[in-house]
Regions:
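Core of compact, soluble alpha-helical bundle domains
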Residues: 1-149, 154-155, 166-193
């Protein structure tokens, strides 16, 4: 797929880094921020080792790191539920003429869902409800415009990620965790304006 992308799109992809840890320096020592940054640089979820180091250094986030770990471990089923929700809400979206056709477009959408949850888990693990980069989001908006990504479907998918994730948590955790999801939903929803 990358061979089919224009140079402009490739540049936007490189700049569409939606997480920022700049404000975290006041809460976490540089070695902990570096763990978050390395995970994001590598496009991966925090490892067990990362989560343990974070919880050891900041014991008050131990429950949050455990939740981030659980969501990471269940990402495939969470993304699958969100995908099913998008397909139920937009039944023709993967058909010819639909916003996620051809299949490579749909695969990119589901991959974005995986990355959205990855970014959300960083916020949860670090107990930072505002974890996005305005600059990265701006470039993501330009990228989505350039690729004509169906924003309605992406917002429905992100809401599905929230629903699927929260149902895997204890009910009393929902109120605490919802803002991490709502933050990114609000940011993505603003792309439509």
């Amino acid at each position: 797929m990358s061979e089919q992308l224009s140079e402009a799109v490739r540049q936007l992809i490189a700049k569409a880094r939606i997480v920022s840890f700049a404000a975290w320096q006041s809460t976490y020592p540089s070695e902990i921020v570096a763990r978050f940054q390395a995970a994001d640089d590598e496009g991966r979820y925090l490892t067990d080792e990362d989560l343990q180091a974070i919880a050891t250094h900041q014991p008050e986030v131990a429950e949050s790191t455990a939740i981030a770990q659980m969501l990471r471990d269940r990402v495939a089923e969470i993304v699958e539920e969100a995908r099913a929700g998008v397909l139920a809400h937009f039944p023709d979206i993967t058909e010819p003429g639909g916003g996620l056709y051809p299949p490579l477009r749909a695969e990119a959408c589901w991959r974005d869902f995986w990355h959205f949850l990855r970014c959300i888990t960083y916020g949860i693990a670090g107990q930072q409800t505002v974890y996005t980069s305005d600059e990265g989001l701006y470039h993501m908006k330009l990228l989505y415009q350039e690729l004509q990504v169906p924003l309605d479907a992406m917002v429905v998918g992100l809401e599905g990620i929230k629903t699927a994730s929260l149902k895997r948590c204890r009910s009393e955790q929902g109120e605490t965790l919802a803002p991490y999801f709502d933050h990114l939903i609000t940011q993505l929803d603003a792309f439509r304006g």
